[in-house]
Amino acid sequence: MSVSPVSIVSTPVAVSASPAGAPDQPVQPVTVRWRGREAYEASFDAMRAFTDTRTADTGDEIWVVEHPPVYTLGQAGDPAHLLVADSGVPLVKVDRGGQITYHGPGQIVVYLLLDLRRRKLMVRTLVTKIEEAVIETLAAYNLASVRKAGAPGIYVASGVHEGAKIAALGLKIRNGCSYHGLSLNVKMDLRPFLAINPCGYAGLETVDMASLEVAADWNDVAHTLVGRLIANLDGASAAADKPHALEQSND
């Protein structure tokens, strides 16, 4: 049985119409923050703190980051999906939905810190918009990809790697606001995926864009992906805050 990557707590995210005579609350442009290479725990703590302290006036943000090697296990995840206990890669238990996945250099990780009530977004709609953004990004590099019913993420559509997973997603919804997000494999060491059942699926092949013979620049793909996410969310221009450049890493 598949496990949803979305974990919902507290208030539901469905939004009713504004009271009669009350104007709709405008949706502010998304601020994009490029956080560089950052330890997973630092990103995890920061997005929880951001979500816990945000108010109705807090703007939505998208964080783009690259993590050192780490496995993350969702709150309902089964530790048995970590097949090699002494792999040398740390395991962090987190509060998103879903099972186990791997993050590492050469992978784009995007966290979506969104007020779903203000945006009048149902969770399923948000997941669809995220998946569409990844599919559109890969299409920009002439890679055909698809979603699978009951198995959130994005998969290779055809060829020798048909059915292999190239992107994963997992969200947490708290008080109508999302955090966590998605990961897209660009050019990375894929061997750590062999030590897990990716997203809880035994034998699931995981690939990156390089495996599909696409020599893509990490930063270029990241900018394409963020652009598609914003366009799919609301079509607004992002207010990009770039405190330091992300470094491409192929190790």
UniProtKB/Swiss-Prot annotation:
Q: Where in the cell is it found?
A: Cytoplasm
Keyword list (alphabetical) reads: Acyltransferase, Cytoplasm, Transferase
Q: Which reaction is recorded as catalysed by this protein? A: octanoyl-[ACP] + L-lysyl-[protein] = N(6)-octanoyl-L-lysyl-[protein] + holo-[ACP] + H(+)
Biological process terms in GO annotation: protein modification process
- The intrachain disulfides are none
* Signal is among the record's keywords: no
Q: Where is this site: Lowers pKa of active site Cys?
A: K165
Please tell me where substrate binds in this chain: R96, G97, G98, Q99, I100, T101, Y102, H103, A168, L169, G170, G181, L182, S183
PROSITE patterns referenced in this protein's UniProt entry, alphabetically: BPL_LPL_CATALYTIC, LIPB
Q: Which residues form the BPL/LPL catalytic domain?
A: 56-241
Q: Which residues cross the membrane?
A: none
EC number(s) on record?
Answer: 2.3.1.181
Q: Output the superkingdom of the source species.
A: Bacteria
The GO terms describing molecular function are: lipoyl(octanoyl) transferase activity
Q: What Pfam families has UniProt attached to this entry?
A: LplA-B_cat
Pathway connected to this protein: Protein modification; protein lipoylation via endogenous pathway; protein N(6)-(lipoyl)lysine from octanoyl-[acyl-carrier-protein]: step 1/2
Q: Which residues form the active site?
A: C199 (acyl-thioester intermediate)
Q: Name one GO cellular component term.
A: cytoplasm
Q: Which family does it belong to?
A: Belongs to the LipB family.
Additional record remark? In the reaction, the free carboxyl group of octanoic acid is attached via an amide linkage to the epsilon-amino group of a specific lysine residue of lipoyl domains of lipoate-dependent enzymes.
Q: What does this protein do?
A: Catalyzes the transfer of endogenously produced octanoic acid from octanoyl-acyl-carrier-protein onto the lipoyl domains of lipoate-dependent enzymes. Lipoyl-ACP can also act as a substrate although octanoyl-ACP is likely to be the physiological substrate.
Query: How is this protein named in the record?
Result: Octanoyltransferase
